[in-house]
Regions:
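Phosphate-coordination loops involved in phosphoryl transfer and adenosine-cofactor binding
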Residues: 12, 87, 150-152, 207, ...
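Glycine/small-residue-rich loop that forms an oxyanion/phosphate-binding "nest" at active or ligand-binding sites
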Residues: 85-105, 109-147
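Beta1-alpha1 glycine-rich phosphate/pyrophosphate-binding loop at the start
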Residues: 13-81, 158, 162-189, 261
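FAD-site-proximal beta/loop scaffold in flavoenzymes
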Residues: 126, 132-148, 245-292, 299, ...
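A Rossmann-like FAD-binding core segment of flavoenzymes
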Residues: 78-103, 108-111, 171-268, 309-315
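Short, Lys/Arg-enriched N-terminal segments with co-localized hydrophobic residues
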Residues: 1-11
């Protein structure tokens, strides 16, 4: 077990990790296996977005598992290595000499290094019943959940590259795919548009927005669509709606510590190293092309090992 030092009444850790998703928990596992004292701070529940996935079937070595169960397994493995945890949202990280002061609403902590693994939230439509229908006809990830609707009728809402990619993926496995966008023109890649629009099982609905959900037995039955040009409303029966209207990284409060892309992601390399020595980034909040469970785990391992090299003076 590693030694945790105290400066006054404040515990000093080798590494504090902000965020308890797959990236954060993986970072904790790697750091503890390297003999570092670790505190992981998570504001809600462990597992991040994966905890809400009905099934996970694209993670090597695990053919099929519930997202919440997989998150619990990760947590158990981390705790078995004596990583410490506390409940709290990290509000600020400030340099304190050679160390860092980390503040939450309820506490102050200190560490020699910090890993920001705060993730990125899928932007929601903000409609009534949207949260309740998650896993019951509403999804934010076709890669994760598309296979559950093989030969079914699905819809994708969004106008960017991610929406086009989701619709392309679904068109390979679903009988019918509707692509819904509030404008006539799409922002996404022209080549993707051409490929998608050429597919016979894809129907494009524009300019349309989703005005509401129709449910049956607590599951999605149909979408209420509104034509943004005429105001006319129609119903569209679907088995699942895939919401692809962008993601929102949660790094605004740390903007002074690291460079951000125009979309708000951390513009840092795979090692997670930032211009501030001792501060690292991992997971979906890092600027990258692919955001999946496997890439989050990879980020967590990379950031933890980079942090350990920093602490050991091996940069």
């Amino acid at each position: 077990r590693s030694v945790i030092f105290f400066r006054g009444e404040i515990a000093m850790y080798d590494i504090i990790i902000a965020g308890g998703g797959p990236a954060g928990m993986t970072a904790a596992i790697y750091a503890r296996r390297s003999g570092k004292s670790v505190l992981l701070l998570e504001r809600e529940g462990y597992g991040g977005q994966i905890a809400y996935a009905p099934r996970v079937e694209n993670y090597p070595g695990v053919a099929s598992v519930g997202g919440a169960e997989l998150a619990e397994r990760m947590l158990e493995q981390m705790l078995a290595l004596d990583a410490e945890t506390d409940v709290g949202e990290v509000l600020s990280v400030e340099r304190a000499g050679e160390n860092f002061t980390v503040r939450t609403e309820d506490g102050v902590y200190e560490s020699r290094a910090v890993i920001l693994a705060t993730g990125a939230k899928h932007r929601h439509l903000g409609l009534p019943d949207e949260e309740e229908l998650l896993g019951h006809g509403v999804s934010y990830c076709a890669v994760c959940d598309g296979g559950f609707y093989k030969n079914g009728v699905t819809a994708v809402v969004g106008g960017g590259d991610s929406a086009l990619q989701e619709a392309l993926l679904l068109s390979d496995i679903c009988r019918t795919v509707y692509l819904i966008h509030r404008r006539d023109a799409f922002r996404g890649d022209a080549e993707k548009q051409a490929r998608l629009f050429a597919r016979k099982n894809v129907t494009v609905l524009t300019p349309m927005e989703i005005a509401g959900f129709l449910t049956e037995d607590d599951s999605l039955r149909a979408l209420r669509l509104k034509n943004t040009a005429t105001g006319e409303e129609t119903e569209l029966g679907v088995d699942c709606l895939f919401v692809s209207v962008g993601q929102q990284p949660e790094l605004e409060r740390f903007a002074a510590l690291l460079p951000l892309t125009a979309q708000g992601y951390a513009a840092v390399p795979e090692t997670g190293e930032t211009p501030v020595r001792g501060v690292f980034v991992a997971g979906d909040c890092r600027g990258k092309r692919v955001r999946q469970l496997a890439t989050a785990v990879s980020d967590g391992a990379n950031a933890a090992l980079a942090a350990c090299r920093y602490l050991d003076g091996e940069e």
